[in-house]
């Protein structure tokens, strides 16, 4: 018999035990994965098509009533709930004589249920200890522990604490919680701690309980509770992490630990045998089972019935959790090894991988199929997690970034102390923001997590993304700045090709007609981003990244009639809708609808809390809500109340700083100390009063797009219009004599501008960092992968993708009386633009 190599043995694990080939299962059961690479199974895995079909048949073939009744339909629901509860226990090999299962919303709800039980079980309160790798929901229990607690920062600390339990006899109730698997990096913690704690705790009165967060583990690994003496007292999990659907969680309780809930104060419908409300305030709790006492109110019985279909579908497709464990272990090892092997041209590692030294991707007992990492460039500088996630999204690759609701694991891996993080919080760092690197360190990580239906193509697709966009093949800066021809500048050389304002934030542009001078204010072009659309539920401003159809909302300013005219739909379509709103703030006599009343409302715009005036007229809300399919209404920035300012920018020589890394020392003179930063007021713009781009730069970018003919997934090499950059000013060059002498990206060296016959002065604040919104076609609302893909390769400064320049009126202009300079404070298509260059820049 021919021997089998270790490599061959590994690949045999790929899909072993599945009903069919992985790709065949994906094509039939997971149509939502078409043209998509999904690598966020730790967040939730995906539901199978046949699961939804099976559940649909259940609902349409049976009548399920509220379980709290004696009707036939209600009893059917009760019977099915009981059956599914037993099936769930057996899935985890939990003996129903030893364990009970309580249905809850999710793992967090189960944790809170245990915490409430511990709090109410004794007047003296309880002590709480948790492992540093705990999910945020486990950390939160500490706020209920009146006896204090401890965060164990290592396994050794836990082992030492366990060994000392028998030395200290205490009546205090104690709870120790930890994750079976870190949701950050997939490291698996010792299951044996539960038995060790129980054995040690029995010598002190058995008052130490264990809580195991199994939510991350059970998504790809079996959980074996067959030995009740070694099992946790409380195990929490979420079924959607295993099956994708239904959205349901569970608390598995060792019955011997059930007395913790005896004194739980709250009771809900269905958990009591009798309640007195008049006179004597008394109630009798149900005693038949633990779940009867804890499942408050009507159970989500439809979801529980769906869980039955989920169990059956999962077993039919994948056979067992052990099969899934082997499959994902093989893929995770391959992905880890490939990322770990990536190097830049100079040998610098591309990936900083955050794997515990205690774990091994070859050992399922120590490591799950999760990989946490960050990227570095060839100089060792960090690449922002947000940029990587945005680029991945343009390629239809779904990943996760941030602190991952794992504050201890993330901060420990990144080297942040509590004092450090408090300081960064004061500096503006918040969960979910794009402060990717602060004080030279990443603030979060990138996470890839695998699931039952992950295949080899998913692994290859992500690694190829990193290789194409982040692995530097050679030391060159040719792609950073386009070549500039060494010819004397013949002034005037630049002029305004087009002027655009965006009256409604994130909607289409209004292009200023040729020959018309347009007012400029400190906040930018008159009427620019003075309105926005806000969600009627949350108050958050809508944007094209979430709602690409906003590009098809076309506002225009009619100064003759003093109205904002809005049309919806593709240009030239016959079914366009029309709305008109008065430009006059107090005028309610509108052409097609009434302004009615406005109400002040707090809204979130680019992370800022902004007070806007929302239009309460139902026709206004209906106009936008019907078109976008989201409940929203129009809102306006209040007059004379700008509390928003342009973001602080790097000095105009930022490109020069970047280039210094590649040229001889002394090539550039030392920069003078920067002047104090000025504040530039804005309305609802993202970052600055005015955004400027160059036609020459757009042309050069399109040349690069066309040159890169390799089409990745659904992307194309089609040229992009300047409109995708949503600039206020497009500057072009006068090239009548020398059409081939364009100077793309020359604007990177501009530090100031004079525009128009009155030479109105502008300051250049810095480069515009770009996001995936530039991939939305402004004429169709269709999302593509360009130009972001090409920009990611050719336009990076300090690891940020940039295109265009932020500008504002010069401070010397705003000190003058605007009324005395009304004509000067205007711009027009065709106005001459005279740039001033950084002091050390020469052609």
Curated annotation (Swiss-Prot):
The gene is hxB. GO terms for molecular function: lyase activity; molybdenum cofactor sulfurtransferase activity; molybdenum ion binding; pyridoxal phosphate binding. Its EC number is 2.8.1.9. It is an enzyme of class 2 (transferase). GO terms for biological process: Mo-molybdopterin cofactor biosynthetic process; molybdopterin cofactor metabolic process. Pfam families: Aminotran_5, MOSC, MOSC_N. Its cofactor is pyridoxal 5'-phosphate. Residues 657-836 form the MOSC domain. Sulfurates the molybdenum cofactor. Sulfation of molybdenum is essential for xanthine dehydrogenase (XDH) and aldehyde oxidase (ADO) enzymes in which molybdenum cofactor is liganded by 1 oxygen and 1 sulfur atom in active form. The modification N6-(pyridoxal phosphate)lysine is found at residue 241. Pathway: Cofactor biosynthesis; molybdopterin biosynthesis. Belongs to the class-V pyridoxal-phosphate-dependent aminotransferase family. MOCOS subfamily. The active site is at 405. It catalyses: Mo-molybdopterin + L-cysteine + AH2 = thio-Mo-molybdopterin + L-alanine + A + H2O. The keyword S-adenosyl-L-methionine does not apply. It comes from Aspergillus fumigatus (strain ATCC MYA-4609 / CBS 101355 / FGSC A1100 / Af293) (Neosartorya fumigata). It comes from the Eukaryota. This is Molybdenum cofactor sulfurase. Keywords: Molybdenum cofactor biosynthesis, Pyridoxal phosphate, Transferase.
């Amino acid at each position: 018999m021919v021997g089998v190599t270790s490599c061959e043995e590994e690949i045999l694990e790929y899909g072993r035990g599945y009903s069919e080939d992985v790709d065949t299962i994906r094509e039939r059961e997971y149509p939502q994965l078409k043209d998509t690479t999904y690598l966020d199974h730790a967040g939730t895995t995906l539901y199978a098509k046949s699961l939804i079909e099976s559940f649909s048949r259940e609902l349409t073939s049976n009548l399920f009533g509220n379980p709290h009744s004696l009707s036939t339909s209600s009893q059917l629901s009760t019977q099915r709930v009981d059956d599914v509860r037993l099936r769930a226990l057996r899935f985890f090999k939990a003996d129903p004589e030893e364990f009970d299962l309580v249905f809850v919303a999710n793992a967090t709800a189960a944790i809170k249920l245990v915490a409430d039980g511990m709090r109410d079980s004794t007047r003296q309160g309880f002590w709480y200890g948790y492992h540093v790798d705990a999910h945020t929901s486990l950390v939160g229990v500490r706020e209920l522990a009146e006896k204090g607690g401890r965060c164990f920062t290592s396994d050794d600390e836990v082992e030492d604490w366990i060994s000392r339990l028998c030395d200290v006899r205490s009546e205090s109730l104690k709870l120790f919680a930890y994750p079976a698997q870190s949701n950050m990096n997939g490291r698996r913690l010792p299951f044996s701690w539960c038995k060790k704690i129980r054995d040690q705790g029995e010598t002190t009165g058995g008052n130490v309980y264990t809580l195991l967060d199994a939510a991350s583990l059970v998504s790809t690994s079996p959980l074996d509770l067959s030995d009740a003496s070694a099992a946790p007292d409380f195990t929490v999990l979420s079924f959607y992490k295993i099956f994708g659907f239904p959205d349901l969680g569970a608390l598995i309780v060792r019955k011997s630990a059930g007395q913790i809930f005896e004194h739980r104060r709250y009771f809900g419908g269905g958990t009591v045998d009798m309640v007195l409300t008049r006179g004597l305030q008394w109630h009798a709790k149900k005693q038949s089972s633990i779940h009867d006492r804890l499942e408050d109110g009507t159970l989500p019985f439809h979801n529980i019935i769906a869980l039955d279909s989920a169990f059956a579908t999962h077993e039919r497709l994948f056979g067992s959790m052990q099969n899934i464990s082997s499959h994902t272990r093989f893929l995770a090892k391959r992905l880890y090894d490939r990322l770990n092997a990536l190097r830049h041209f100079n040998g610098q590692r591309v990936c900083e991988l955050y794997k515990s030294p205690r774990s091994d991707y070859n050992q399922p007992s120590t490591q799950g199929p999760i990989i946490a990492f960050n990227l570095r460039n060839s100089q060792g500088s960090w690449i922002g997690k947000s940029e990587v996630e945005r680029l991945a999204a343009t390629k239809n690759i779904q990943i996760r970034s941030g602190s991952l609701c794992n504050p201890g694991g993330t901060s420990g891996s990144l080297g942040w102390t509590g004092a450090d993080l408090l300081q960064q919080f004061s500096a503006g760092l918040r969960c979910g923001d794009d402060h990717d690197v602060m004080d030279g360190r990443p603030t979060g990580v990138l996470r890839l997590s695998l699931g039952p239906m992950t295949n080899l193509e998913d692994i290859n697709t992500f690694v190829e993304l990193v290789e194409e966009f982040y692995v530097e093949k050679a030391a060159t800066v040719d792609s950073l700045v386009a070549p500039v021809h060494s010819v004397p500048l013949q002034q005037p050389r630049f002029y305004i090709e087009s002027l655009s304002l965006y009256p409604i934030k994130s909607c289409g542009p209004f292009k200023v007609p040729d020959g018309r001078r347009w007012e400029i204010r400190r906040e930018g072009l008159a009427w620019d981003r003075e309105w926005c659309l806000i969600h009627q539920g949350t108050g958050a401003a809508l944007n094209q990244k979430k709602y690409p159809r906003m590009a098809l909302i076309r506002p225009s300013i009619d100064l003759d009639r003093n109205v904002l005219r809005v049309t919806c739909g593709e240009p030239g379509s016959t079914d366009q809708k029309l709305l008109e709103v008065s430009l006059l703030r107090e005028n309610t006599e509108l052409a097609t609808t009434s302004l009615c009343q406005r109400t002040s409302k707090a809204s979130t715009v680019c992370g800022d809390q902004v007070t806007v005036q929302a239009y309460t007229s139902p026709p206004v809300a209906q106009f936008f809500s019907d078109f976008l399919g989201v409940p929203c209404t129009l809102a306006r920035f209040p007059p004379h109340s700008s509390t928003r300012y342009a973001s602080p920018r790097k000095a105009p020589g930022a490109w020069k700083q970047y280039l210094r890394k590649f040229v001889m020392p002394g090539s550039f003179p030392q920069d003078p100390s920067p002047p104090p930063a000025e504040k530039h007021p804005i309305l609802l713009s993202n970052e600055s009063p005015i955004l400027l781009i160059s036609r020459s730069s757009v042309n050069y970018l399109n040349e690069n797009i066309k040159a890169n003919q390799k089409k990745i997934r659904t992307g194309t090499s089609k040229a992009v219009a300047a409109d995708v950059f949503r600039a206020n000013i497009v500057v072009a060059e006068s090239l009548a004599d020398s059409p081939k002498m364009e100077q793309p990206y020359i604007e990177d060296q501009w530090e100031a501008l004079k525009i128009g016959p009155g030479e109105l002065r502008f300051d250049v604040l810095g480069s515009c960092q770009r996001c995936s919104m530039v991939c939305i076609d402004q004429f169709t609302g269709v999302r593509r992968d360009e130009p972001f893909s090409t920009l990611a390769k050719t336009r990076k400064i300090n690891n940020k993708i940039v295109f265009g320049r932020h500008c504002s009126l010069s401070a010397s202009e705003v000190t003058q009386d605007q009324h005395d300079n009304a004509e000067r404070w205007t711009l027009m298509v065709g106005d001459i633009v005279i740039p001033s260059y950084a002091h050390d820049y020469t052609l």
